[in-house]
From Swiss-Prot:
Keyword field: Cytoplasm, DNA damage, DNA repair, Nucleus
Identification of the protein by name: PCNA-associated factor
Top-level taxonomy: Eukaryota, Metazoa, Chordata, Craniata, Vertebrata
UniProt-annotated location(s): Nucleus; Cytoplasm, Perinuclear region
Chain span(s) of sequence motif PIP-box: 68-79
Biased composition (Acidic residues): 115-125
Length: 125
């Protein structure tokens, strides 16, 4: 612990007990009526700030690109949107559980012999 000058001055230092130094706190912003009007800070855009933060950069406002989807499309109810392939019952020609990427079954076949390995094998003999 740290002793301060106030702790060393006086009779309390001789008794061995001392007080811990407490850091000062920064003043907090108050969102309401304030006693002094000079402390009132406005937003950089000059507009009155809304009660909720809507995201984005308030200093350099940029337009939303046309390709960006709206947030309502993500939270829309599934009954109004078209059912996804994952959520519907597979038809007879589809196989359940398959990704559908490769329709033909793949057969494993050995790799062709490497010519550099064959040359190394013939040198050993």
């Amino acid at each position: 612990m740290v002793r301060t000058k106030a702790d060393s001055a006086g009779s309390s230092a001789s008794s061995g007990s001392y007080r811990k130094a407490v850091a000062a706190r920064a003043p907090r912003k108050t969102f309401g009526s304030s006693s002094s009007g000079s402390n009132h800070v406005t937003s950089p855009t000059g507009k009155k700030s809304e009660s909720k933060y809507a995201g984005g950069n308030p200093v350099c406002v940029r337009p939303t690109p046309t390709w960006q989807k709206g947030i309502g499309e993500f939270f829309g109810s599934p009954s109004t949107s078209q059912p996804e392939k994952e959520n519907r019952i597979p038809s007879d020609d589809e196989e359940a559980g398959g990704s559908g990427a490769g329709k033909a079954p793949r057969k494993s076949r050995p790799l062709p012999p490497d010519p550099s390995e064959e040359a190394a094998d013939s040198d050993d003999e």
